[in-house]
Amino acid sequence: MAEQNTQQDLREILQIRRDKLKALQDAGMNPFEITRYDVTHHAQEVKDNFDALEGQTVSLGGRLMSKRGMGKVSFCDLQDKSGRIQIYARRDEMDEEAYNRFKKFDIGDIVGVKGEVFRTQKGEMSIRAHEITLLSKSLQPLPEKFHGLTDKELRYRQRYVDLIMNPESKRNFEIRSKFVAFLRRYLDNLGFMEVETPVLSPIAGGANARPFITHHNTLDIDMYMRIATELHLKRLIVGGMERVYEVGRIFRNEGMDTKHNPEFTTCELYQAFTNLDGMRILQTTLPYKVSTLASPPNTAVVYGMDTVVYRSMPFLSY
């Protein structure tokens, strides 16, 4: 019964939002027409430089995440890629027609805000809005704010909603991007060359895993999506490239859960004229250097039931 009520409520919300969209279009306003908005600052940038920006006019773009008030004074939270900031809107400080339109905006709408940086009586860093422009209308409601998007299945299948509702997920994306960029710089500085090897191969080799199989129409042969980058990288070493690596996607037609995806990224590298000790140097220094991207050096990181402290340590032989 509760699920039926939830579905009914969702249908009603969707219909209300479609009605608002139609009303805008009937009034000659296309909420998807604006393709450019001049953003001068981001939310966290305003907060970090509040003393210098206080009293100045800035422009921000982002998603409405909450709305409060709706009389002569309204408050809302604007979220952009850097975080959230409060927007303060007064009817007597905006065009009255524009203010009335703003009151009909929904949570999830993409808006542009132009206004003055100031601090409210309660001390909240805010933007006193002069203009609030609807840039894109949201027809689908966001998960309610108190519980957010907690269903793991939905979080992984609708990652775009997860990114909106869970700052930690966005943080993970940022850390991964920094990690891959750092990894490339680190290996490049050691004289390694990044290469791209074929994703499709007539044989499945380099690892013990079940491959995905596809058919090459022109050659009329079955081919395999790679389960490792090993074979082609070794051929490059044979060809005279002394240090090579690849950050690439791997495909293994096996089990799937929240920590095991059939499509994933690896970094595989090979170097000539060295031995096990040469690879040990990379093994002992690279994890420590990479760990500092996510936390300060020597920080304890809790992983499951274990506590891990990454330090630069010498290799111990037994």
Predicted features along the sequence, with ranges:
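Class II aminoacyl-tRNA synthetase catalytic cores and aaRS-like
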Residues: 1-318
